[in-house]
């Protein structure tokens, strides 16, 4: 018979929790009464916010890198080739569109490399593999 993966399931029934001894109950309730019943802030489970952000950014079409920092980066890189270069705003916009499209595509390939290695976390070696498979780096 073939093996199948077991998945964890939440229990719907089972034993009721045991009653605590009076001293344990008093010890557990004492700190909460001293602090004045301050409620802890709500926290989502790990991964929930990440999945929400993934869905949000996959729906959106706006640029993710801020315009001015990207413009400064382009001008800084261009200084190495020629001083006093001028750029049309549409040229910097086109560079930014192309750069973001390239980065998104590269991270998609990097994620596939991590998944292939049976991981969910991308690592530098995944990025190196993705670039090598594309022929960008030997």
Swiss-Prot record:
UniProt GO MF annotations: DNA binding; protein heterodimerization activity; structural constituent of chromatin
Residues with N6-acetyllysine modification: 10, 15, 19, 24, 28, 39, 59, 67
Modified residues (N6,N6,N6-trimethyllysine): 5, 28, 39, 82
Entry keyword set: Acetylation, Chromosome, DNA-binding, Methylation, Nucleosome core, Nucleus, Phosphoprotein
Compartments, record wording: Nucleus; Chromosome
Source superkingdom: Eukaryota
Gene3D superfamilies linked: Histone, subunit A
Cellular component annotations (GO), alphabetically ordered: nucleosome; nucleus
UniProt modified residues of type N6-methyllysine: 5, 10, 15, 19, 24, 28, 39, 82
Record's keyword annotation contains DNA repair: no
Residues modified as Phosphoserine: 11
Subunit details: The nucleosome is a histone octamer containing two molecules each of H2A, H2B, H3 and H4 assembled in one H3-H4 heterotetramer and two H2A-H2B heterodimers. The octamer wraps approximately 147 bp of DNA.
Family of the protein in this entry: Belongs to the histone H3 family.
Name of the protein in question: Histone H3
Organism: Cryptococcus neoformans var. neoformans serotype D (strain JEC21 / ATCC MYA-565)
High-level lineage: Eukaryota, Fungi, Dikarya, Basidiomycota, Agaricomycotina
């Amino acid at each position: 018979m073939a093996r199948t993966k077991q998945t964890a399931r939440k229990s719907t029934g089972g034993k009721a929790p045991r009653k605590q001894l009076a001293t344990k109950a008093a010890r557990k309730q004492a700190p909460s009464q001293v602090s004045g019943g301050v409620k802890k802030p709500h926290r989502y489970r790990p991964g929930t916010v990440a999945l929400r952000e993934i869905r949000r950014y996959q729906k959106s079409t706006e640029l993710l890198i801020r315009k001015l920092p990207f413009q400064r980066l382009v001008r800084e890189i261009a200084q190495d080739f020629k001083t006093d270069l001028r750029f049309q705003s549409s040229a910097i916009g086109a560079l930014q569109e192309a750069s973001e499209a390239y980065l998104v595509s590269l991270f998609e390939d990097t994620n596939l490399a991590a998944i292939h290695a049976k991981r969910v976390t991308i690592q530098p070696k995944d990025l190196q593999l993705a670039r090598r498979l594309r022929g960008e780096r030997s």
